[in-house]
């Protein structure tokens, strides 16, 4: 027994002596580790710098601009005609342009500011003000308390619309800068003609938006302040230091540390169009995510609706329409039409499109329609949100499908400028990009949402869950009669 112990000790000592005689490889190992590229989500974001003089963002391969627009409270034929003319004659050809409708639950700051003049007074003021604030914050986090017979997804949200566009960057090209500045003026004037006022988004606005979309917290109701670092690239400032992502077949899991230091996980799911909708109207587009007549057909979780479109070259589409028409016309005059009778209808459709393209009455547009939802990391919450999205849009004639195995791709497509960096071509190769005429695409734009009315006053949420305040003397409400107003609050 003693011999075995002595042999074991001897073997251990010999191993240590041999290890000490070997050359030290720690320095080489450290050099190897230092040369390795570890995966960072910020590395795939294109944002680099912002030029405040021109209002342009400098990205990896592109240069572009971004607007924040006020959502339309409604629409009519004249607004649709103005937007169709904008798509057909004002947008650059072959350039992806993205429209983003963001439904945010970060309404805590707006609630505090809006209720500052409607606060309780007296000895119990602090207590009752806290109860009122907690009531509305709880409604934004989950939903308003209703009787058991009324299980409606009524909550509080803030809707915002963003428009982004970028073109391939040319080195040391002053002409391109001037062209982009002119493009900004043209688009803002055209959107103003459709009663859509805009403002140019700067670097701080972009970073704040991206930090909200990339670093979600299902329990956070307040915007987290962030001070922009002028000496660091924008893409690194968009991602939280504690960011973590897990990619699965059915969803994305984004984790981060909350303000309390505890880890919070959000489940992100994407949906895109299975086929072109047969009929769509701009004035009913808001009913797809918050139906007024059927409130149960609403999306209660935070979401982002993204429509990325690219107006195709007019000459190429004219040639394509001519070739298609001649091909189906030839088939319609043979026995082929007896076995496939739809070829007659197809010939008529391509004939009409060819005529409208030849007279510049329309243009063909390639577009990608995507919805991204944010829910708590639970199967029940994810399934409930999925049914809300699919059922709400099915009511409006839209057939959506979950982006199984492609949630990361769709998540990246949701981000501004990402499609202009080459992702749109990947979407086309994947077969998820649809084609339609400018009139149909104008009716698909996600730009209709309820108005917040006034920044402060009597809190009166809308049926579409928009956080709104009523102040009859606020100039932004465009009131013309101030003779008498009667209002009341709880208590």
Annotate the PLM regions.
Residues 2-445:
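Extended, folded cores of ATP/NTP-driven motor/assembly subunits in large transport
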Residues 55-62, 70-72, 79-91, 188, ...:
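Glycine-rich phosphate-binding loop of nucleotide-binding enzymes
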Residues 147-149, 355, 446, 452-457, ...:
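Glycine-rich, charged/polar anion/phosphate-binding loops
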Residues 431-465:
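Pre-P-loop entry segment of helicase/translocase ATPase cores
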């Amino acid at each position: 027994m003693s011999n075995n112990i002595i042999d074991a000790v001897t073997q251990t000592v010999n191993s240590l002596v041999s290890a000490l005689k070997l050359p030290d490889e720690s320095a080489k190992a450290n050099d190897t580790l230092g040369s390795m590229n570890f995966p960072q989500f910020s590395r795939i974001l294109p944002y680099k710098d912002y030029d405040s003089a021109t209002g342009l963002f400098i990205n990896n391969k592109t240069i572009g601009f971004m607007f924040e627009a006020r959502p339309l409270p409604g629409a009519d034929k004249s607004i649709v005609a103005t937007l169709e003319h904008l798509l057909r004659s004002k947008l650059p050809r072959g350039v992806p342009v993205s429209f983003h409708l963001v439904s945010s639950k970060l309404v805590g700051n707006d609630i505090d500011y809006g209720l500052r003049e409607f606060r309780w007074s007296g000895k119990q003021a602090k207590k009752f003000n806290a109860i009122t604030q907690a009531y509305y914050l709880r409604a934004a986090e989950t939903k308003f308390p209703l009787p058991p017979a009324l299980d409606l997804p009524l909550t509080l949200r803030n809707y915002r619309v963003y428009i982004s566009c970028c073109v391939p960057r040319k080195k040391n090209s002053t002409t391109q800068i001037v062209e982009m500045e002119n493009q900004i003026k043209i688009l803002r004037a055209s959107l103003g003609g459709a009663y859509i006022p805009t403002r140019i988004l700067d670097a701080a606005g972009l970073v704040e938006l991206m930090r909200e979309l990339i670093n979600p917290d299902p329990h956070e109701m307040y915007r987290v302040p962030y001070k922009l670092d002028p000496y660091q690239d924008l893409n690194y400032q968009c991602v939280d230091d504690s960011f973590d992502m897990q990619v699965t077949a059915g969803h994305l899991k984004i984790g981060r540390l909350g303000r309390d230091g505890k880890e919070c996980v959000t489940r992100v799911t994407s949906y895109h169009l299975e086929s072109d909708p047969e009929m769509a109207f701009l004035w009913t587009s808001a009913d797809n995510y918050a139906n007024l007549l059927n409130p149960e057909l609403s999306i209660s979780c935070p979401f982002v609706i993204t429509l990325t479109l690219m107006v195709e070259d007019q000459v190429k589409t004219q040639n394509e329409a001519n070739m298609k028409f001649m091909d189906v016309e030839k088939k319609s005059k043979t026995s082929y039409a007896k076995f496939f009778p739809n070829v007659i209808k197809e010939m008529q459709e391509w004939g009409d499109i060819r005529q409208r393209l030849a007279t510049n009455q329309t243009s063909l547009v390639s577009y990608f329609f995507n919805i991204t939802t944010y829910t708590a990391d639970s199967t029940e919450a994810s399934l409930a949100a999925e049914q809300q999205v699919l059922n709400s849009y099915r009511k409006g004639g839209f057939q959506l499908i979950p982006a199984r195995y492609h949630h990361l791709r769709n998540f990246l497509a949701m981000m501004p400028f990402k499609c202009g960096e080459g992702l749109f071509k990947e979407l086309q190769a994947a077969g998820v990009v649809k084609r339609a005429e400018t009139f149909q695409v104008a009716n698909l734009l996600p730009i209709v949402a309820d108005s917040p009315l006034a920044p402060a006053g009597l809190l009166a949420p809308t049926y579409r869950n928009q956080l709104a305040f009523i102040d009859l003397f606020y100039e932004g409400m465009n009131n013309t009669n101030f003779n008498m107003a009667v209002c009341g609050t709880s208590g």
